[in-house]
Amino acid sequence: MNNHYLNQGCSFEKVSKNILKKNSHCNPWLSFFNQQDSEHQIFSLKQNDIIIFDVNSKLYIILAGCLIVKKVFRNRKKIILNVLTSEDSFGHTQFASNRFYYEVEALDVAQVLSIEYSIIMNICQNYPNFSVFLVNHLLLCSIKANHFMEIISHKSITNRLISLLLLLSEHNGISQNNGILIDLTITHKVLAQIIGSNRVSITRIISKLIHTKFISMQKKKVIIHDPILLSQRFSNR
């Protein structure tokens, strides 16, 4: 398993024109930047690729995929702060110090847009509607980050895992006849890291959820058969 540490000067893997065209129709950021001919980059991340932030970091916007934000201390201890999905942004936290820094890691294949802050500021000055959009977006980011903190603050590891699966199904789910497929390949070890548990506990809980038919597995991806029923199980615990 290789980690690819990315920085501002690296050569990113290009995204195909067909994918760009598809994303431009459904992503408001990309659509606006293309309309205004604003300079930006689009690149792909493979599973476990990492972006490390410094004070010169750009604004990054997720077009597709799922990433986790980590606070990394100089003793290599890591704290997961949030799970990011399509249309979320990151890079606007610039509080790195000599004690810690921030990084994001791709949980699966992801497509990300990056743009200089100076360009964003120029757009805000010339397009008031974009400024309103940006403020609303940052408020939603704050709400989502708070939601994630609520998830990992549950005393019950089972509740944490169920809440995380429901969150992922909401943002990365694909509707099927037998339920919602979480379109991510995430190991039990990574799930454990996200919610502050261990692989053995996660394996035990998932096995129990499979046995009680709340979820099933399809090619290493989780299917939630009835999200409402699963959330009721969570609320009744």
Curated annotation (Swiss-Prot):
Primary location recorded for the protein, binned into one broad class: plastid
Organism of this sequence: Porphyra purpurea (Red seaweed)
Q: Which UniProt keywords apply?
A: Chloroplast, DNA-binding, Plastid, Transcription, Transcription regulation
Its recorded name reads: Putative HTH-type transcriptional regulator ycf28
The chain's coiled-coil residues are: none
Question: What gene is this protein a product of?
Answer: ycf28
InterPro entries on file:
cNMP-bd_dom, cNMP-bd_dom_sf, HTH_CRP, RmlC-like_jellyroll, Tscrpt_reg_HTH_Crp-type_CS, WH-like_DNA-bd_sf, WH_DNA-bd_sf
Domain of life, per UniProt, equals Eukaryota
Q: Which residues bind DNA?
A: 188-207
Domain named HTH crp-type: which ranges? Answer: 155-228
A single cellular component GO annotation: chloroplast
Q: What Pfam families does the database record attribute to this sequence?
A: cNMP_binding, HTH_Crp_2
